[in-house]
Design a protein with these regions (language model features):
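C-terminal "post-core" interaction segments
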Residues: 1-168
Length: 168
């Protein structure tokens, strides 16, 4: 039998106490994947150009896995078992979401500032988008490529951070 016969769809109804959303800024990096991308992609059919990806392109993982153990030889298989789509049946973002978004704003991942600090580059770009101000789009090359792997480093490391890589 076809596995597609086991597909399930879930629809959410509007709630009377819901706040009407006018614009949403999603902050992401090359390390944003899977569930984060699922949330962003799920909003595109409903909010369209009122959403923006802030930061850099996402990882590009519109699939999920299941684990299957083989006790005979102590192996574990990670099987790609499902692909995620939104209400418009869009789900081919294997190179990240930047090329699928109507609006993007390039910003550095400023790990030297506290989460939520309006002076942090990604937060500032997100607030600018929400206020209707212009921003620099995520560049074409970074919009097409997946995650850039590498150690996160502060822009201006302290003496201790310089000596001990990975210290925050």
């Amino acid at each position: 039998p076809e596995k597609s016969s086991e597909n399930e769809s879930y629809s959410l109804r509007a709630q009377s106490q819901a706040v009407p959303v006018t614009r949403v800024a999603f902050i992401g990096t090359g390390a944003s994947a899977s569930a984060s991308e699922m949330v962003i992609n799920g909003q595109l059919p409903f909010l369209g150009a009122a959403t923006a990806l802030i930061g850099s392109n996402t990882y590009g993982k519109p699939v999920g896995q299941i684990a299957r153990d083989r006790s005979v030889c102590d192996d574990r298989f990670r099987i790609v078992a499902f692909r995620v789509e939104n209400a418009s049946r869009q789900g081919d973002y294997y190179t990240g979401l930047a090329s699928k978004m109507a609006s993007t704003c390039q910003a550095a991942d400023d790990i030297g500032r506290p989460l939520g600090d309006p002076a942090e580059a990604s937060m500032r770009a997100g607030l600018d988008f929400l206020a209707g101000r212009a921003c620099t789009p995520i560049s074409g090359q970074s919009a097409r490529s997946g995650a850039n792997r590498g150690l996160l480093r502060p822009t201006k490391p302290s003496a201790a951070q310089y000596q001990l890589e990975g210290l925050f």
